[in-house]
Amino acid sequence: PIFSIQQSSMDQTSFEDGTIILISAAGATGKTSLTEHLSNELSIPIFDLSKHDPVASNSLTGLLYNNMELQDFAQFSMKLKEGKSSMIIDALDEGFLKTTIDGFYSFLDDVAKMSNGAKGVPFIMLGRTNIVELVTLYLESKNVKVVLLQIEPFTVESAKVFIDKHVESEGKTKFEEQYKTVRDYIINAIGGFFKNQSEINHKQYLQFIGYAPVLLAISTLLNDNNNYHALLEDLKSSNRRNIQLVIDIIERILKRDKEEKIDKLLLPTLTK
């Protein structure tokens, strides 16, 4: 992925001085793959909040304590302080949804306590843009030096590669030319929608087409329709022109978020 350094509310913290690196992305922009790559390359553990019980005070230290021998726990905690090891905390947005605001802030208090005075970067934290901004403000209020990175949207060409990797239908291999034709038609049709809106510029089109949930929605459409010739003709029909295609994609994104975020994470906490 392509990263950009974002300005935080405090004076810009240099990459070398930061004790926590926060990585934000608008949606499913490869954060999971990035997390796994960092963990493998750096040989550091991952604390995935989407798979953990709702966090609160002592969740972080409790996790380490419960998964290590007492001696290993003490050594790893010391390594975090001395800059000899790090830990990845993933899925901040899921963690936020599963707990109370006080519980989430208590969890961040633990992170801040372990980070203040530490050498190196004890924590790398990832999540969606809105929650990462909240975490940044809270940690900075606790005098933690934060470096804020953002995963930039895919380019048009990398968007095509992303779609190709997520389309697994046999038709893609058997009818490669037809597949690429309809794939490119969809991308261009979305561009046509933005082009026809005078108040929306080319940059916003690139942000939309580079947004991973949009690409996942396109991939789902191509996975669900193996007859690419028929799909192309349907897309070209008068009732499926640019604006309807964009609406269809947005509806798919909303459905995916409902199934993955609201149904799985939020509703269980509301019905307890």
Where are these regions (language model features)?
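Short, flexible/disordered intra-domain loops and linkers
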Residues: L60, L64, F96-Y105, T136, ...
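Post-nucleotide-binding-loop coupling segment downstream of the phosphate-binding loop, primarily
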Residues: I21-S86
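Conserved catalytic network of the ASCE P-loop NTPase/AAA+ motor domain
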Residues: S77-K81, K113-G120, S141-N143
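Walker A/P-loop-proximal flanking segment of P-loop NTPase domains
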Residues: P1-I20, H37
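Short acidic, S/G/P-rich loop/turn micro-motifs used as interaction or catalytic elements
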Residues: T29-G30, H52-A56, L92-T99, N130-V132
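Extended hydrophobic
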Residues: L38, V132, E140-K142, P153-K160, ...
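Sensor-1/coupling segment of RecA-like P-loop NTPase cores
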Residues: M114-L137
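Conserved P-loop NTPase "ATPase switch" module shared by AAA+ and STAND
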Residues: K79-F104
